[in-house]
Design a protein with these regions (language model features):
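Nucleotide/phosphate-binding catalytic cleft detector across ATP-hydrolyzing
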Residues: 1-18, 22-167
């Protein structure tokens, strides 16, 4: 059964590590989950064919099959991305934190793409496990969002302000 809209209140703690993104999501009913995902994504080619999935009341390995379309003023673009293991398995060009570029965590798009994808998939998985349907729209109210910055960026007040503005 497909319902049009679901509304969720969540609290999220997210650590976008250079190699792995660790995310804890807690829902208003007290349930929560922790996921660990490779910190990388791959843009989806406009010519790429992605197989259709049949509607199901179960999402198997949702953390391994993230395919997201993100429209965000922080990214200044609307794009489709494969995230984590889905990106690795795609054969597409991978984008990760370029630690040698010395950009930090505030500037790169990956700092927004990873948590947005993980929050969306956690919300979908929660709705499927509790209500057993796939909504067309999920409205998420983040009551709390906690993230980490390297000390070198945290001590810089302007970098903190920039991250808050992006979020």
């Amino acid at each position: 059964m497909t319902k049009k809209t679901s509304n969720l209140v969540m609290a999220v703690a997210n650590d976008n590590g250079n190699g792995w993104a660790k995310t804890y999501c807690q829902f208003e009913d007290g349930t929560g989950n922790t996921t660990i995902t490779p910190s990388l994504y791959a843009p989806v080619s406009k010519h790429e064919t992605i197989p259709d999935l049949e509607e199901s009341n179960e999402v198997q390995d949702f953390n391994d099959n993230m395919d997201v379309l993100i429209k965000s003023p922080s990214l200044k673009t609307t794009s489709e991305y494969l995230v984590g293991k889905a990106a690795i398995n795609s054969g597409n060009n991978l984008i990760d934190y370029n630690v040698e570029a010395n950009l930090g965590k505030v500037t790169p798009d990956i700092s927004m793409i990873m948590p947005l994808a993980k929050i969306a998939y956690a919300a979908l998985n929660h709705i499927l496990s509790v209500a057993k349907y796939i909504p067309t729209t999920i409205n998420i109210n983040l009551a709390y969002y906690l993230t980490c910055l390297p000390i070198s960026e945290f001590v810089n007040k302007e970098r903190r302000k920039t991250l808050c503005k992006k979020l």
